[in-house]
């Protein structure tokens, strides 16, 4: 029900019931160049059950042999823009048909300048075993020039409760030299990236806004945090997503370069969010909303799940100029996944989409009652 991404891999062998195909085809109104099969299978799913036979029934030669980290950005590559527009149109029509479409503008009101916080912003860095990159990330965070006070949370996670490669000691050393660093090491062995965010967000030292910085990435320049906070006050939103530049570890630009996620529009972004595989970076949050909803305690898709839940009721703001460098290197967690791990990740996000789809249908029914 929630497998709405247009790159869902059904495999090369698909059997269709003729009468169901004919019925679905009669409801097709658009002549797509790229979204034809996607539109068809969405319409099939509106009236029929799609069944996966979990047995080996055939073999084929894989033609796309790129690593998962290379395929990850296909949907935001500018050369694929027109096909993505078609996919969005097909998905939006499907959401309207099943009662999950959310009309633009129906948001809960926000006043992000209300209330008192110890600092205006907190930079969030979950970390585990990033001795090669954590100093770059922390230096980037500490070098921000702002008109307000901010701090930097570094939250360790993983089965050992802390890093085992020297990261913990390096962060401790940097924290002794700069009191803005809030280094959290717990005795929890179940803590994932999402749980690390929750721990920092509920800490009384957390600021009005919480801004993402992954432990192997860096901000584009010293003005990133100021731009984020200014945008929150200008747009009065619960979540803010920026644009980023794809680079290697040495900050050399990699194709497709700037990822601006222009598929997000104020009118239809939260509907299209159910189709795409990610919302963008860096992600920042108004802390009271983050504390209200929280992230799932996982190491994958936790930010996507939170973004979907926020977008159901609150406005998500955007910055389309690159303010963040997403570094691709040999130790990216999603750089070269096995087929089994990639499938596991996709199933998790599809489950998030299913739950969100059901929540939106329920919301619309309640509003119509």
What residue spans do the PLM features occupy?
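Acidic donor-binding loop at a coil-to-helix junction in glycosyltransferase catalytic cores
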Residues: 31-40, 299-306
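A recurrent flexible, glycine/aromatic-enriched loop bordering the glycosyltransferase active site
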Residues: 2-15, 262-284
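Catalytic beta-strand/loop signature of glycosyltransferases that borders the donor
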Residues: 51-57, 63, 243, 317-323, ...
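Glycine-rich, basic loop-to-helix element that forms the pyrophosphate-binding segment
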Residues: 187-205
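Short, acidic, metal-binding catalytic loop of nucleotide-sugar glycosyltransferases
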Residues: 139-149
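Conserved donor NDP-sugar-binding/catalytic core segment of glycosyltransferases
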Residues: 1, 223-256
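A conserved acidic beta->alpha catalytic loop
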Residues: 156-170
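Short beta-strand-to-loop acidic/aromatic patch adjacent to the donor-nucleotide binding site
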Residues: 207-218
């Amino acid at each position: 029900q929630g497998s709405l991404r247009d790159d869902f891999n059904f495999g090369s062998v698909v059997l269709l019931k003729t009468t169901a195909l004919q019925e679905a085809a009669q409801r097709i109104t658009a002549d797509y160049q790229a979204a034809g099969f996607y539109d068809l299978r969405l319409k099939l799913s509106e009236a029929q059950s799609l069944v996966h036979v979990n047995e080996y029934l055939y073999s084929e030669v894989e033609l796309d042999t790129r690593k998962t980290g290379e395929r990850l950005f296909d949907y935001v590559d500018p050369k694929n823009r027109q096909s993505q527009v078609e996919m969005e149109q097909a998905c939006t029509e499907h959401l309207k048909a099943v009662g999950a479409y959310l009309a633009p503008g129906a948001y809960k009101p926000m006043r992000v300048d209300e209330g008192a916080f110890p600092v205006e912003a907190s930079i969030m860095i979950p970390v585990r075993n990033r001795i090669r990159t954590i100093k770059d990330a922390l230096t980037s965070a500490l070098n921000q020039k702002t008109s307000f006070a901010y701090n930097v949370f570094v939250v360790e996670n993983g089965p050992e409760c802390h890093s085992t490669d020297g990261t913990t000691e390096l962060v401790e050393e940097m924290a002794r030299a700069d009191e803005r660093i809030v280094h959290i090491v717990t005795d929890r062995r179940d803590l994932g990236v999402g749980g690390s965010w929750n721990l920092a967000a509920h800490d009384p030292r957390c600021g009005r806004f919480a801004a993402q910085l992954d432990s192997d990435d860096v901000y584009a320049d010293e003005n990133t945090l100021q731009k984020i906070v200014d945008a929150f006050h200008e747009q009065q939103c619960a979540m803010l997503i920026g644009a980023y530049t794809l680079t290697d570890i040495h900050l050399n630009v990699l194709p497709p370069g700037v990822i601006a996620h222009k598929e997000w529009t104020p009118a239809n972004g939260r509907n299209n969010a159910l189709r795409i595989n990610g919302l963008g970076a860096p992600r920042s949050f108004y802390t009271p909303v983050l504390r209200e909803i929280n992230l799932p305690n996982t190491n994958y898709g936790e930010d996507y799940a939170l973004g979907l839940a926020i977008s159901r009721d609150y406005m998500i703001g955007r910055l389309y100029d690159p303010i963040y460098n997403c570094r691709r290197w040999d130790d990216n967690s999603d750089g070269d996944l096995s087929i089994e791990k990639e499938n596991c990740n996709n199933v998790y996000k599809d489950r998030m989409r299913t739950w969100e789809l059901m929540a939106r249908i329920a919301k619309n029914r309640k509003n119509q009652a």
